[in-house]
């Protein structure tokens, strides 16, 4: 039972990972990524990861 729950959680998390779009825009904070993501993908869903913006759909 625990294994099936873990597999289900892994599948759900991997779906979210596949929807993320990396950009080459440098950033120091997530707030800087919101207008970039809005312009590139139509939604202001994004955050700064490792110095670059990552947008979510």
UniProtKB/Swiss-Prot annotation:
In the record, what terms sit under GO molecular function? ion channel inhibitor activity; potassium channel regulator activity; toxin activity
- Gene3D superfamilies found in the cross-reference section: Knottin, scorpion toxin-like
What are the residue positions of the site described as Aromatic residue of the functional dyad? Answer: 56
Going by the UniProt record, its keywords in alphabetical order are: Calcium-activated potassium channel impairing toxin, Disulfide bond, Ion channel impairing toxin, Neurotoxin, Potassium channel impairing toxin, Pyrrolidone carboxylic acid, Secreted, Signal, Toxin, Voltage-gated potassium channel impairing toxin
Cysteine pairs forming cystine bridges in this chain are 27-48, 33-53, 37-55
Q: Which GO terms describe its cellular component?
A: extracellular region
> Which superkingdom heads the taxonomic lineage of this protein's source?
Eukaryota
Renumbered to this chain, the signal peptide range is 1-20
Compartments where located: Secreted
Q: In which tissues is it expressed?
A: Expressed by the venom gland.
UniProt-annotated site: Basic residue of the functional dyad, residues: 47
Extract the Pfam families matched here: Toxin_2 (PF00451)
Q: What does this protein do?
A: Potent blocker of both large-conductance calcium-activated potassium channels (KCa1.1/KCNMA1) and voltage-gated potassium channels (Kv1.3/KCNA3). Has also been shown to moderately inhibit Kv1.2/KCNA2 and weakly inhibit Kv1.1/KCNA1 channels, as well as 5-hydroxytryptamine 3 receptors (HTR3A).
State the similarity comment. Belongs to the short scorpion toxin superfamily. Potassium channel inhibitor family. Alpha-KTx 01 subfamily.
Name recorded for this polypeptide: Potassium channel toxin alpha-KTx 1.5
């Amino acid at each position: 039972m625990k294994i099936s729950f873990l597999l289900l959680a892994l599948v759900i998390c991997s779906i979210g990972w596949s929807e993320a779009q990396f950009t080459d825009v440098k950033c120091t904070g997530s707030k800087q990524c919101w207008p970039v993501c809005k312009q590139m993908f139509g939604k202001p869903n994004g955050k700064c990861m490792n110095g670059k913006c990552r947008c979510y759909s």
